[in-house]
Swiss-Prot record:
Name of the protein: Neuraminidase
Residue intervals on the Intravirion side: 1-6
Membrane topology: Single-pass type II membrane protein
Lineage of source species: Viruses, Riboviria, Orthornavirae, Negarnaviricota, Polyploviricotina
Assembly information from the UniProt record: Homotetramer.
Location(s) in or outside the cell: Virion membrane; Host apical cell membrane
BP GO terms, sorted: carbohydrate metabolic process; viral budding from plasma membrane
Its EC number(s): 3.2.1.18
């Protein structure tokens, strides 16, 4: 083959290779375009699954439930139409209490990122229930958890997370800077109340759907404080009780009526011989019933009931089955404060049914240990100590703490009555245990008209944690 033939042959081969390469590149471009078109077409579509609509979108949703599967957000669509929670139903008839949630926060926090918290509570809208809690601006098993036995600090905040989940930075939502708080839903939006500031000049910041709408300044300049449980909404108005003044003597107590985050009316209770703190409130046939803590001189619990005009009645639970802690042994009750072991106290609750009531209380008379529910059919009005039902919730040997009421509205449950529920705080750490921190987990129960069981659902985390050693 002469040189010219070699050149022609090599050139022909190069041309063929170039043409093949060009064809491959064109095919690759077409393939990429087709693949992109398919992905784009599938990015936003709906499909029917058991008559429920499942929507897949690469976008952020509000008021939806997310289920995380293989890092893909599957959004289960549901009716988010606003309604006004009427609050005009009576309490559901019940035979006992069924376990609703348990978050095991301290146990999980020994290894995972879980907030140091206290004062957890639950509140429900017509769509969902949420756990609210006061953080200490710190995580369990971390150096910043040191000294969190302190109640009031600028690091505390009201946050929320799904019921039954351990409160962590990954599932929690900031609500308000607060060392005392309340929250509730009127069917259209969340009202949050967060109190923060110095003891002699604290301010309550009211938010409606996350926007500041009102502030309330301490009027007695002596630790303004509120419920540490849910406020109550009836027919578009929400109600809360605040206390300002001594914790061991007569103080000032005010009821506030709030609409869309704005205070529309308030009154001060005329209660010179009573003490109302950390009230647990619930709606019942368009009225509001609150059962509170007497930290001054009562080992039974004070109550106040009021209508939407803030006309009120008040008294003490008469039963000789005493609900506070510390308290004397059960005996003869009183429709006024029972002074024996009446100083100090713990947040608690009861539900009234006619002349009777369900009384929630610690099992121990002198320490925050154990928890039980007692049905006293005449306890609201009769001072004897007879009761018919006792249901064990936490054993005497295990720590408990604050407790409070919350309800599930008919708009959520589909029932024709208001379902009564309660939560119990399970405090761990200081001052009773050898740790540098104070925190807790929580459990909750709802009333049912069917079979229930006695058992113990304790926190049961093994202490001390690594940070304490």
């Amino acid at each position: 083959m002469n040189p010219n033939q070699k050149i022609i042959t090599i050139g022909s081969i190069c041309m063929v290779v170039g043409i093949i390469s060009l064809i491959l590149q064109i095919g690759n471009i077409v393939s990429i375009w087709i693949s992109h078109s398919i992905q784009t077409g599938n990015q936003n579509h709906t499909g029917t699954c058991d008559q429920s609509i499942i929507t897949y979108k690469n976008s952020t949703w509000v008021n939806q439930t997310y289920v995380n599967i293989s890092n893909t957000n599957v959004v289960a669509g549901k009716d988010t139409t606003s309604v006004i929670l009427a609050g005009n139903s009576s309490l559901c008839p019940i035979r006992g209490w069924a376990i609703y949630s348990k978050d095991n926060g301290v146990r999980i926090g020994s290894k995972g990122d879980v907030f140091v918290i206290r004062e957890p509570f639950i509140s429900c809208s017509h769509l969902e229930c949420k756990t609210f809690f006061l953080t200490q601006g710190a995580l369990l098993n971390d150096k910043h958890s040191n000294g969190t036995v302190k109640d009031r600090s600028p690091y505390r905040a009201l946050m929320s997370c799904p019921v039954g989940e351990a409160p962590s930075p990954y599932n929690s939502r900031f609500e308000s800077v607060a060392w005392s708080a309340s929250a509730c839903h009127d069917g259209m939006g969340w009202l949050t109340i967060g109190i923060s500031g110095p003891d002699d000049g604290a301010v309550a910041v009211l938010k409606y759907n996350g926007i500041i709408t009102e502030t309330i300044k301490s009027w007695r300049k002596e630790i303004l404080r509120t419920q540490e449980s849910e406020c109550v909404c009836v027919n578009g108005s929400c109600f809360t009780i605040m206390t300002d003044g001594p914790s061991g003597g007569p103080a000032s107590y005010k009821i506030f009526k709030i609409e869309k985050g704005k205070v529309t009316k308030s009154i001060e209770l005329d209660a010179p011989n009573s003490h109302y703190e950390e009230c647990s409130c619930y709606p019942d046939t368009s009225k509001v019933m609150c059962v509170c803590r007497d930290n001054w001189h009562g080992s039974n619990r004070p109550w106040v009931s009021f209508d939407q005009n803030l006309d009120y009645q008040m008294g003490y639970i008469c039963s000789g089955v005493f609900g506070d802690n510390p308290r004397p042994k059960d005996g003869k009750g009183s429709c006024g404060p029972v002074n024996v072991d009446g100083a100090d106290g713990v947040k608690g609750f009861s539900y009234r049914y006619g002349n009777g009531g369900w009384i929630g209380r610690t099992k121990s008379n002198s320490s925050r240990k154990g928890f039980e529910m007692i049905w006293d059919p005449n306890g609201w009005t009769d001072p004897d100590s007879n009761f018919l039902v006792k249901q064990d919730i936490v054993a005497m040997t295990d720590w408990s703490g604050y407790s409070g009421s919350f309800v599930q509205h008919p708009e959520l449950t589909g029932l024709d009555c208001m379902r009564p529920c309660f939560w119990v705080e399970l405090i761990r750490g200081r001052p009773k245990e050898n740790t540098i921190w104070t925190s807790g987990s929580s459990i909750s129960f709802c009333g049912v008209n069917s079979d229930t069981v006695d058992w113990s659902w304790p926190d049961d985390a093994e202490l001390p944690l690594n940070i304490d050693k």
